[in-house]
């Protein structure tokens, strides 16, 4: 049997007042997701250990069977591996966002979802100013980049998406790398202030990328191969470096899809078709990750989150029509509209294709929590359980 796990990043939510106390999953029209839940078996899963912050890095690693307490080093390290960045044993890689700071507050953790081309121009100017510090900047997709610090010692940092609307001073880096990271941030603010890219963005009514925000730095992770753990060849389809970093560390195939953006305008159907085609080859398992639902949660947009769920559901429908195997559906964590950031609450999952069913009628948080026959499953046990046919 072959297996496909469809993951809507941040898709789970809390009751929303604007929706009459319902969640986006309860309001969205999603007949295909509901079919998986209705005809299959369901359960709840805690994807983030109490010892870790509720990030997509930790949650996705955990779902794939890797204990974050044992294998996780940092988000920056995973994204650096994905980008093929030279990574020595004494180096630390930090995730590095372009952000918008206004009146000393974190206005926008994604700098208006700056384009990758604009980001490259900003980084080229900043790298020139930082050339004497030995630091290397590697532009990624949109606002997501990597800062490589040779000889780094570590720093306590805060994810910028967790502090939107708050003063940044209490959340500046602390620890051994703090002074140098803060220096880089100050220099970036100076370099970006009158940069042509930002002048054009401001003129167009867009948020400028007026500073960098380094966070989640760590050493290169050492993880066992997915094929050795499970005896199956795995592949990952995504649009973000984080997921590709996990895949490369785990020895899984990386499948990139034209038109997959990691944002609301991603090519949902293109990803679904790529998943089906990949499973026609020698891959036994495909992990299909969609970021758009998470981005909508961070924006606090009920409309966009419902739209993202419904567009993902169309892709799920294509998969159900064209793939005859085991299909799993779940989020990695909630990204509640009201909070605009991740939480560590358990998430609902559904499995179709292993036989058996329960009393669940629709794919929603409440329905599955009340009626799912799997109960509460440990995230690192999911694939072992599914591959064993349970």
Positions of predicted regions on the chain:
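Feature captures the catalytic ectodomains and active-site-proximal regions of enzymes
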Residues: 1-390
């Amino acid at each position: 049997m072959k297996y496909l796990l469809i993951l809507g990043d941040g898709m789970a939510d809390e009751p929303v007042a604007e929706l009459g106390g319902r969640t986006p999953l309860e309001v969205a029209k999603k007949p295909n997701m509901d079919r998986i839940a209705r005809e299959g078996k369901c359960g709840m899963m805690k994807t983030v250990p109490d010892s870790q912050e509720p990030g997509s890095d930790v949650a996705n690693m955990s779902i794939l069977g890797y204990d974050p307490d044992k294998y996780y080093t940092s988000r920056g390290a995973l994204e650096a591996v994905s980008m093929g960045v030279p990574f020595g044993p004494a180096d630390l890689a930090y995730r590095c966002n372009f952000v918008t700071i206004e009146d000393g507050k974190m206005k926008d953790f994604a700098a208006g979802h700056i384009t990758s081309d604009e980001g490259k121009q900003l980084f080229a100017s900043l790298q020139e100013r930082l050339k004497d510090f030995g630091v290397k900047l590697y532009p990624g997709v949109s606002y997501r980049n990597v800062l490589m610090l040779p000889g780094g010692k570590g720093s306590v940092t805060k994810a910028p998406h967790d502090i939107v609307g708050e003063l940044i001073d209490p959340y500046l880096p602390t620890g051994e790398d703090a002074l140098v990271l803060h220096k880089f941030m100050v220099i970036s603010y100076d370099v970006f202030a009158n940069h042509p890219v930002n002048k054009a963005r401001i003129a167009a009514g867009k948020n400028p990328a007026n500073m960098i925000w380094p966070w989640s730095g760590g050493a290169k992770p050492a993880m066992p191969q997915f094929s050795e753990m499970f005896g199956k060849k795995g592949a990952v389809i995504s649009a973000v470096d984080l997921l590709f970093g996990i895949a490369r560390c785990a020895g899984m195939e990386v499948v990139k899809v034209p038109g997959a953006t990691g944002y609301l305008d991603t090519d949902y159907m293109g990803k679904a078709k790529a998943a089906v085609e990949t499973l026609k080859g020698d891959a036994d398992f495909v992990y299909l990750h969609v970021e758009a639902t998470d981005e909508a949660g961070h924006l606090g947009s009920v409309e966009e989150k419902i739209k993202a769920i419904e567009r993902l559901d169309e892709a799920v429908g294509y998969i159900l029509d064209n793939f005859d195997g085991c299909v799993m559906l779940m989020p990695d964590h909630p990204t509640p509209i009201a909070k605009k950031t991740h939480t560590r609450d358990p998430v609902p999952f559904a499995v179709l294709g292993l036989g058996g069913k329960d009393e669940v009628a629709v794919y929603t948080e409440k329905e599955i929590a009340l009626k799912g026959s799997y109960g509460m499953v440990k995230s690192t046990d999911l694939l072992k359980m599914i591959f064993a046919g349970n």
